[in-house]
Amino acid sequence: MPAAEAARVGGDWYDAFLQRDGAAVVVIGDVVGHDTAAAAAMGQLRSLLRGIAHYSGAGPAEVLHGLDQAIADMHTDTLATAVVARLERADGNGWRRLRWANAGHPPPMVLAPDGQVSVLGGDLGDLMLGVDPTTERAEPVITVVPGEIVLLYSDGLIERRDSTLDEGMARLAMHLKELAGLPLEELCDALLQQMLLGTPQDDVALVAVRLCTERDRYHS
C-alpha cells in the first residue's frame, strides 16, 4: 500500500493494518489545527483508532463511534475528520467488499483500470469527530475488483484559495483518470505534483490501495 505525504507539523495522518479476521483497514484523518498540539492529538487518535479496531474487530462505523466516545470520555477539545475503510474478501476471484464510514472528511475515490473514477459518498459524510459521541454513522458497502485503486486523501490535497473543495475534487478526479495505469508510488507522487503545484497550502496526506490481479500474484 504505497503512500506519499508532504510532511509538516500538523494533524494529518494515515494508517493501514489488519484486523484479527484478516480484513484490511485503511484510515486517513485530519485533526483541526496546524501546530504541535494538533500533531500530538493526531498521534493519540491514530493509536486509539488502531486499538479500537483491532480489539473489537468492528466495522468502520462502529470504530468511529468508539473513537468519538473515547474523545468524550477523556474530556479533550480535539476535533478531527476521518475516513475508515475496511476491505473484506468477497469471493475466490479477488473481489472485495469495501465498507467505509466518513466523519466529515473528503470522500474516498475509486479508480478503475480504464480510468473511470467513482466518488464514494460524494460529500463530506457524517459529523466530524469530537462534536457529539452519540452520532449515528452510515456504513455504505460496495464491491471492488482486482486492478481497482482505492484512494484516501486529506483536504490539503484539494484545497486552493482560489477555488472550492468541489472544484478541487473535480481536479483530483481528472488527474486520477489521466494517471490510470501507473504504479502506485508513481501515481501518488504525480498526484502530489499536479495537485499542489509547488508548496502545499495545508498539511497533505495521501494513501492508495490497489487490489492485486492474477497477473500480480503470478509475478510476485
Residue ranges and their predicted role:
Residues 1-150, 163, 190, 198-220:
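… and, occasionally, acidic/histidine-rich disordered N-termini of signaling adaptors
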Residues 49-53, 173-179:
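Short regulatory/linker helices and ligand/cofactor-binding micro-motifs at input modules
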Residues 56-60, 178-187:
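Short, charged, surface-exposed loops that flank catalytic or proteolytic processing sites
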Residues 145, 168, 172-177:
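Divalent-cation-assisted or electrostatically stabilized phosphate/pyrophosphate-binding catalytic cores
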Residues 155:
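Conserved catalytic-loop aspartate of Hanks-type protein kinases
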Residues 159:
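Short acidic/polar inter-strand loop motif in beta-rich domains
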Residues 171, 186-190:
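Exposed alpha-helical structural elements
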Residues 179-182, 194, 198:
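Hydrophobic alpha-helical segments
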